[in-house]
Amino acid sequence: MKRTAFGGTDPGKKRVNNEDALLLNDTLGLYAVADGIGGNEGGEVASRIAVETLGRAMPDLLGEKDRTPPVGRVRADDPSVSALREAVFLANRAIHQERSQNAALPNMGTTLTALLLRDKQAFIAHIGDSRAYLFRAGKLLQLTDDHSFVAEQVRAGTFTLEQARSSPYRHMITRALGIAKDAQAELTTRALKNDDRFLLCTDGLTEMVADAEISRVLASSSPQEAVQKLLAAANERGGVDNITAVVVWVVEV
């Protein structure tokens, strides 16, 4: 598989700290973004633990495709899905343990959106409101559903999209790593095609930049150019939150 990737993060115009984190491992084909929550540096700690745990765990987990599952746990998934699921479980446990051991960080947690490219497939793990997009054949597809209060209201038909965008509860997420012992991450797969372009991003980007502009940027830019343009666009529109983007271009499957 021939691919190229680039990632970047920016604190934005309103925040001093950057609670976002990202992961790029071209050797493994593993990429991720995380958006920490909790304040008092807790968000920074949680997002860093998430991507570091993912990066450390996945090489070993992918190298143990035939290992016996722990007692009481059934492995019915594709080996890559199982590895990604286990890595998310380990990241959640690591954040949960840090919370319990550090009284200064009682409320910390993080979103996580991860992409694994392997065996001509894209494997995506997602929890929270960071997103994964696929730009294919001129169309932008959102591959993840936000785990947030307003997104759930839109899906239920209670809110319109306009109401969701202006709601004071639009930043309230309903799932995150580190909050509960069961992370409840969603995992999906998709067959790859030549010229697929993936975007992983935190809500600091999607709150500021419309899908139409994201499409134009992904259609006409290299991964590095795309990331730089998207971060700049979010800041030009106010940069009210930390902004993180990872763009992966599958040149040839």
Q: What is each stretch, according to the model?
A:
Residues 1-253:
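PP2C/PPM-type serine/threonine phosphatase catalytic domain
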